[in-house]
């Protein structure tokens, strides 16, 4: 459930199909995101999941799986 919502957020920001977004995909190299795209994705995640991702944690997000892990951690706090 969380992964599908994450896929939708990323797909909307990057104009991709959700099924092209895998846990192993890197935002920059695989999905073609730039720093503004990543910022928009993080903002979308925070809004959709009603969480806050600290800046130091956001800087560690390289793959879609990293973002999913941050969501999981924030929801379990």
Where are these regions (language model features)?
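C-terminal structural segments of small proteins and small subunits
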Residues: 52-54, 58-76
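Short, structured secondary-structure boundary patches
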Residues: 25, 40-43, 59, 76-77
